[in-house]
Amino acid sequence: MIIDIVGAGALGLLYGGKLLASGNQVRFWTRTTAQADLLSHDGVTIVEQDEEIHILPDQIQAKPISELTDTWKNTPGEWLLLMVKQTSIDDFIHEISPLQDHVLNIACFQNGMGHLAKLQAALPKSLLCSAVTTEGAKRTQSEVTRAGTGETRLGKYNIHIVASTSIEEERTFTLSGSLQQAGFDCTVSNEIDKLIYRKLLINSVINPLTALWRIPNGELIVKEERKRLMRQLYDEVLLIYSASGICLDQDMWDQLISVCRSTATNTSSMLADVLTGRGTEVRSINGHIVRMAQKLDLVAPTHEILLHLIEGMQPEGVN
């Protein structure tokens, strides 16, 4: 199967490298030519607890994203795994807009919300799947270290509005099977919206606070003052979800604390962005919570304050 990986960061290389090692043809698409050349020159090594996978330079197909459209028209891929951050979605849509009349199968791995509606408007004939994953990885120049074994769940975007056709279901199960064969715990879910809102809640609490205090995830729960602010953010989301008819598990607070424990040494993606001076996904995470509240004539004051605080931490000119 030909699989396109857009975004050659830690997760993109983890998924792409393992899919390549299990027999798929994988094409990596990077932001710049220099990034593609570096990947093609160095190859990549994937480090796991019990093995290392060495992807040699001559096995790597890497090109800048600007060449994706022409390449895809000549040799269509069967699936495209979109692994860029929310802040790069508009650039991706710009690059792929010439394919708006084609049918692409796209699995979207983004945090936060808002990107799927944008993509559906830009690519109305394509199949969009949400991918919710607890996989984590860290990258050095040519090495990716997998942070334990997570779960990946796939589901069609807006399945509660438009049911999947048999062909769409078959395509989604094919991708799930390929990911399983590559060593990922992947299943197809009919409750993907619930999983998305669960992850949004967790990210809206953990990400901004770790970025603000510059601490790993586990440090959030070692002081009662921090847990009180976590609970305030959590309660605001639950009120908004309840008004929106979104139901989560009764033990959601315990699940949130458990995530902090199980990822205790992890640096959240938002903290990593702040430390390196990159734009964050706060508008798509806490900003989305604020927008949900506004549509319901409710307020999310703590989320709104954190939204402005994190945006204010970004360097001038970075969005």
Where are these regions (language model features)?
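Hydrophobic anchor at the start of a short beta-strand
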Residues: 3, 25-27, 106, 128, ...
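Active-site-proximal catalytic alpha-helix in oxidoreductases
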Residues: 193-221, 225-238, 265
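NAD(P)+-binding Rossmann beta1-loop-alpha1 motif at the extreme N-terminus of oxidoreductases
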Residues: 1-55
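Helix-loop-beta segment of a Rossmann-like dinucleotide-binding subdomain
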Residues: 143-159, 214-220, 266-276
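Rossmann-fold dinucleotide-binding core
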Residues: 109-195
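NAD(P)-dependent Rossmann-like dehydrogenase/reductase catalytic/cofactor-binding core
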Residues: 231-319
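Rossmann-like NAD(P)(H) cofactor-binding subdomain of soluble oxidoreductases
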Residues: 55-143
